[in-house]
Structures are given as structure tokens and as C-alpha cells.
Amino acid sequence: MKVFLIGANGQIGQRLVSLFQDNPDHSIRAMVRKEEQKASLEAAGAEAVLANLEGSPEEIAAAAKGCDAIIFTAGSGGSTGYDKTLLVDLDGAAKAIEAAAIAGIKRFIMVSALQAHNRENWNEALKPYYVAKHYADKILEASGLTYTIIRPGGLRNEPGTGTVSAAKDLERGFISRDDVAKTVIASLDEKNTENRAFDLTEGDTPIAEALKKL
């Protein structure tokens, strides 16, 4: 399967590029905003193409054409204002979803945020971020694409364990970025994740088994 990765320079995106390098079943095309970002991704075994989430859906669709699935891990990051959260986490995601339809790509995996579907559990200090994730997820669910929405808990940089908790509702928890990336790739091949959204935290269940039990 040829996978189009949006957010390849982010922390989860970089882990995905590394994991795809050793995966014989999938190849990766990574979207970047700047020409100088291409070299490191190509050195890691990815095809790299230029496109911008603040551009048009048609621009993104042209970059993604010929791929079989889109993985969206992009985010504005904690150092930017909520204007960028709106432009990247919400509008950028909406454009990527529209681009999938334009390019004829049916499979779409979104990395969202724990409890983004449940307003009662949003962190007050991060409410605009949760609003963006909530409505981006809603747009994907209504798109007609075959979607998977993964809502990870607080992200950590410790090495992954390969074991997780995955369920429709997990009120709090943390997870290694390694294990988020591994769950994304496992979801590509696990039919039971299709048209599902789930929370993801640390746990004791091997990733493949956790996805089968959703």
C-alpha cells in the first residue's frame, strides 16, 4: 500500500517514516512545506513532495495522487497561537479530507486527541485545540471515506512497549509516541479499525490484539 503522510516532520510523523522504512508491505510519500525538508526524509527512505496545508485541497490532492491511504498527524504545535491551531488542526485537516476525495483515496487515518469527542472532559486551558480536533474528526466521520480516528492520551518520548489500552472511552492516560506510530501502521491492515474512533493510552494488551478487540 502506498501511504501519503501529512505531518512527516512532527514527532509522530518522524517515527512513522522510520517504521515504514522497515515495512515491506507499505511505502510512504511524505508531504513537506519546504524544499530543504525533503533531503532528510528521502535519506530515511521516503518519497517527499511539496504541498502546504494552508494551500488548496487541489494542491494537496495533486501531491497525494496515486496513493492508497492518507495518514494525518499534522499539528500546529504548542509554540504557536490558536490562529495556527485553526488553520492546521481544523482547516488543514478538512482540506486533507477533501483532497482525499479529489484524489480518489478512500482510506484515511487521523491522529486526534484523547476525549476529543467528549466536551465534558476537555482541558479548559486547551479548549481551542480540542474544538479543532473535535470538528476535524466530525468532518472525517461524515466524509464517506473509510476512516480510523486514533485519539492518544498525553504524549511521551519514552521507548514504546508495544502494549496499549484502546477503547471508545478512556478518560485519562499517557502513551509513548512510538506506540502511537505503531498503532497507526497496525490500523492500516486491521479491518476492525475501519470506520471507528477510539482513545489510546498505555496498557497491557499487544497493539494488534487491542485493535481486534475494539
From Swiss-Prot:
Its EC number is 4.-.-.-. Belongs to the NAD(P)-dependent epimerase/dehydratase family. It holds the Pfam family NAD_binding_10. Keywords: Lyase. The keyword Transferase does not apply. CDD domains: SDR_a5. InterPro entries: NAD(P)-bd_dom, NAD(P)-bd_dom_sf. It is an enzyme of class 4 (lyase). It comes from Bacillus subtilis (strain 168). Induction: By high salinity. The keyword Lyase applies. This is Uncharacterized sugar epimerase YhfK. GO terms for molecular function: lyase activity. The active site is at 129 (proton acceptor). It comes from the Bacteria.
